[in-house]
């Protein structure tokens, strides 16, 4: 039986270090279920999902984070978007053959990772780092080193649990109020956390996991937050996109297909617009202009 998708925040009482633990297997399953991705791409999306959930939980404001991988290999794009409510969605775009057991480099080729932080109120921030690490976690380490943010380490695990895909992970971060000497404590905790196995994350209760990892430490565990798949697509958003098309383009599609079928690449939902729908959209467009 799958454990509920949740994010757990915790704090080391004797160190200026905070932590997070997330399990997102059901959300991972939802992201994959409308697509037929090769196994290495499935794994990449699972890793991105865990990373995005953990990073989103570090936000001190309402907003969202998008973590995306782009490159010139067969996997042109892999992206996960999540918000402060831990609502996640994601997709990959593939153009070419992805061989079994492909590495990140073999899938993406020469590329980069973009992390975009978008507050509900405020300016957007975007960080870019070249994909030079062997794994996504390595690339995230590079990102934190280059962006001069608080020392942060992520530990990402994906796999199969009870015949279904599973994804989880942990994050450690030094607090802004950290005193001198915290770096040594942080490194010690990183070494302990690195021993976590996927099977432990997927099957054990959070308190047991923390006890196994940090049985000599005093850990404060906070109330969990639910993690879920949630797509933000809607018929209105599709209509807003159609408004940007010229009448000539719309008429051409109608003559050819009889309607316009718009499919969300995140969740697979189809939105059908016939001639009457499009006429109403045109009227709305004219009203907006006046």
Swiss-Prot record:
CDD domains: Hsp33. Under oxidizing conditions two disulfide bonds are formed involving the reactive cysteines. Under reducing conditions zinc is bound to the reactive cysteines and the protein is inactive. SUPFAM superfamilies: Hsp33 domain, HSP33 redox switch-like. It comes from the Bacteria. InterPro entries: Heat_shock_Hsp33, Heat_shock_Hsp33_C, Heat_shock_Hsp33_N, Hsp33_helix_hairpin_bin_dom_sf. It is found in: Cytoplasm. Keywords: Chaperone, Cytoplasm, Disulfide bond, Redox-active center, Zinc. One of its GO terms (molecular function) is unfolded protein binding. Coiled coil: none annotated. GO terms for cellular component: cytoplasm. GO terms for biological process: protein refolding. It holds the Pfam family HSP33. Disulfide bonds join 231-233, 264-267. Belongs to the HSP33 family. HAMAP family: HslO. Redox regulated molecular chaperone. Protects both thermally unfolding and oxidatively damaged proteins from irreversible aggregation. Plays an important role in the bacterial defense system toward oxidative stress. This is 33 kDa chaperonin. It comes from Photorhabdus laumondii subsp. laumondii (strain DSM 15139 / CIP 105565 / TT01) (Photorhabdus luminescens subsp. laumondii).
């Amino acid at each position: 039986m799958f454990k509920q998708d949740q994010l757990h925040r915790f704090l080391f009482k004797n160190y200026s270090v905070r932590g997070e633990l997330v399990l997102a297997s059901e959300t991972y399953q939802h992201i994959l279920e409308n697509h037929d991705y090769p196994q290495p791409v499935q794994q990449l999306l699972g890793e991105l999902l865990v990373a995005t959930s953990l990073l989103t939980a570090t936000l001190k404001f309402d907003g969202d984070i998008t973590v995306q991988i782009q490159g010139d290999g067969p996997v042109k794009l892999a992206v996960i978007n999540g918000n402060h409510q831990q609502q996640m969605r994601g997709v990959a775009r593939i153009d070419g053959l992805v061989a079994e057991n492909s590495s990140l480099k073999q899938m993406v080729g020469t590329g980069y990772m973009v992390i975009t932080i978008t507050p509900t109120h405020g300016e957007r921030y975007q960080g870019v780092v070249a994909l030079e690490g062997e794994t996504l976690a390595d690339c995230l380490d590079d990102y934190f080193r280059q962006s001069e943010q608080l020392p942060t380490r992520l530990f990402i695990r994906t796999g199969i649990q009870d015949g279904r895909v599973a994804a989880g992970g942990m994050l450690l971060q030094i607090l802004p109020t950290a005193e001198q000497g915290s770096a040594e404590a942080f490194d010690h905790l990183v070494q302990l956390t690195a021993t976590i196995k996927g099977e432990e994350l997927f099957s054990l209760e959070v308190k047991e996991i923390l006890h196994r990892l940090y049985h000599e430490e005093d850990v404060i565990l906070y109330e969990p937050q639910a993690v879920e798949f949630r797509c933000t697509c809607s018929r209105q958003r599709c209509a807003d996109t159609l408004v940007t098309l010229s009448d000539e383009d719309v008429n051409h599609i109608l003559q050819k297909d009889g309607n316009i079928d718009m499919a969300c690449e995140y969740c697979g939902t189809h939105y059908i617009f016939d001639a009457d729908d499009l006429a109403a959209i045109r009227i709305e467009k004219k009203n907006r202009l006046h």
